[in-house]
C-alpha cells in the first residue's frame, strides 16, 4: 500500500513539473510563470533517467550500427535534460540566488558523472566508431549536415577519453568531477563580484551625453544605496 501511495505521489509531482513535457507557449519558450525552484532537481533526475534508458536502447540494438540507429538516436536523446539545463544554467549565470547556487553545486557533479557515463561508454563508442569507419571506407554516403553530426560525436567521444584504458578513465572521471565543482565555484565568485560592483559618480557633468532616463535610473540606484545626490551604476 505504501509503495502505491509513493508511486502516486511521484506521478502527481511529475505531472505538475513543467520541464517534463514540451512548453505549451508561443515558440516553445520557457513557461517561467509555472517554473519553481523545486522543479529543477526532479527534472534533472528524470532527464538523466530518460537519457540513460535511451542510451541503453542504442547500445542493445541488435542491428548493425547505422547513422540512423546510432548517431540520430544519440542526438535525439536527453530531451528533458536539455530542456531543464537550458533554463537552469541561463538563470544561474544571470539571475541567481543562494538557493539556486546551492542547487547548482549539487547538480554539477551529477551532470559531470552522467556525461562521463555516456562518453566513456565503450559499447556506445564502438557503435559511433563503426559508423565513422563506414563513412571513411565509403560504405555510406552522408549529406554535409549528417557528416558534421557524425564527426562531432566521434571527436567528442575521442576527446572525452573513450579510447583510454580503464585506469586512466577512472582518473579522468575524478578530474571531471573536480572541474565541474571548481567551475561552479569560480562562476559564483565572479557573479558575486559583479553584483557587488558599484560605479559612483559625484559630478553630474561627468554624465554628459547619457540619456535622461539612464541618468534618472542611476540617481534612483544611488538613493537605494544610501548615496543621495550621486549617481550609481552597477554591472
For the regions a language model picked out, list residue spans one by one.
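C-terminal motif of bacterial Sec signal peptides marking the signal peptidase cleavage site
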Residues: 3-7
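Zn2+-dependent metallopeptidase catalytic domains
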Residues: 8-235
Amino acid at each position: 500500500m505504501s509503495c502505491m501511495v509513493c508511486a502516486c505521489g511521484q506521478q502527481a509531482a511529475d505531472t505538475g513539473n513543467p520541464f517534463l513535457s514540451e512548453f505549451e507557449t508561443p515558440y516553445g519558450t520557457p513557461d517561467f510563470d509555472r517554473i519553481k525552484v523545486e522543479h529543477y532537481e526532479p527534472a534533472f533526475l528524470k532527464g538523466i533517467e530518460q537519457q540513460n534508458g535511451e542510451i541503453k536502447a542504442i547500445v542493445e540494438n541488435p542491428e548493425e550500427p547505422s547513422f540512423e540507429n546510432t548517431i540520430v538516436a544519440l542526438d535525439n536523446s536527453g530531451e528533458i535534460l536539455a530542456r531543464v539545463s537550458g533554463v537552469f544554467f541561463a538563470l544561474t549565470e544571470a539571475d541567481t540566488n543562494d538557493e539556486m547556487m546551492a542547487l547548482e553545486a549539487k547538480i554539477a557533479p551529477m551532470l559531470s558523472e552522467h556525461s562521463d557515463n555516456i562518453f566513456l561508454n565503450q559499447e556506445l563508442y564502438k557503435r559511433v566508431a563503426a559508423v565513422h569507419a563506414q563513412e571513411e571506407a565509403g560504405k555510406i554516403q552522408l549529406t554535409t549536415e549528417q557528416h558534421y553530426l557524425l564527426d562531432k560525436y566521434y571527436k567528442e567521444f575521442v576527446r572525452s577519453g573513450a579510447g583510454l584504458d580503464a585506469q586512466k578513465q577512472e582518473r579522468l572521471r575524478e578530474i571531471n568531477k573536480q572541474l565541474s565543482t571548481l567551475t561552479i565555484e569560480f562562476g559564483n565568485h565572479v557573479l558575486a563580484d559583479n553584483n557587488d560592483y558599484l560605479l559612483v559618480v559625484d559630478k553630474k557633468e561627468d554624465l554628459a551625453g547619457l540619456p535622461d532616463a539612464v541618468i534618472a535610473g542611476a540617481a534612483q540606484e544611488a538613493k537605494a544605496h544610501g548615496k543621495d545626490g550621486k549617481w550609481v551604476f552597477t554591472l
